[in-house]
Structure formats: structure tokens, C-alpha cells
Amino acid sequence: MPSGYVETSIISYLAARPSRDLIVAARQQLTHTWWRERRPLFDLYVSQVVLDEILAGDPDAAERRAVLASGIPLLDITPEVADLAAALIQRVPLPITAGADAAHIAAAACHGIEFLLTWNSTHIANAELRPRVERVCRESGYPAPVLCTPDELMGGEDE
């Protein structure tokens, strides 16, 4: 079964109230559809970075997010993950404020996760940054995960 790292934005979209913003509402619907129909086809993982992010903010929303993440195995944030995150910040480069985003990528890469599922197109699922992220991962000795959104992991017609 393919493996997937669930980044914070996925859990946040699942737990959020329906948005009035059309684009956000469409992403929420796609996320719910993926979670319902495709999630069983993947071994999913999160990291402590995800847990820290989902537990921040409004206590009621944080509880809804925590329930969704419960039972998803936790990847360790090892020294290798920290080193790769630092390399991504320095060599992609990513802004220092994108430390959590770099940690998501690094956790997935260091643990050999095939897909990183996210709605963060600023620093993660970004077509311009993707080749540089892949290069830094490869040069650091890790396979880069496929950085993608739920609609990119909906499967083919013959599935």
C-alpha cells in the first residue's frame, strides 16, 4: 500500500466549517471526498509538527482536528529530519519562517514516505520549488516525496 504524509492543511480543511470562499469550499469538498474514498488505500502518517500545528488556535477547532489525527501513526522528528529541514531552508531556499513546512517535507523524505498530501502551495506543493526540493533531498541521500494536493491523488479511471 502506498504511504502518505498528511500535512496540517489537510486536517484543517477536514475539521473546518464550510467556507464561504468558493476556492476554499471546493478544496474542503475535495479533501472530504479524498478522505472518504481514497484514504483507505494509503498508509497515512503525521509528525509531531502536524500535531503541534493542529493543537494551536481555537480550542474547539483544535479538538476537532485532534480527533481526525488520532490513530494516524506518528513519524519521529530525528536529527536527520532536522538536518534535512535545515538544508531545505538554506538550499531551496525557503524563508526561515517556513521551518514547519521544511520539517514536513524532511519528515516525509527521511522516513521514505511516497506522498506528502497538502494544500500549502506556497512552500510545499509548489511547481517552481519542487525540482529544488527534490534535488536537496536527493543530494542529502533521501528520496523526495511526491508533493501533491488531494485532487492529484484521486486515482485513475481504471482504479
Task: Label each residue range with its predicted role.
Residues 48, 78, 150-151:
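Residues at the C-termini of beta-strands that transition into short coil/loop
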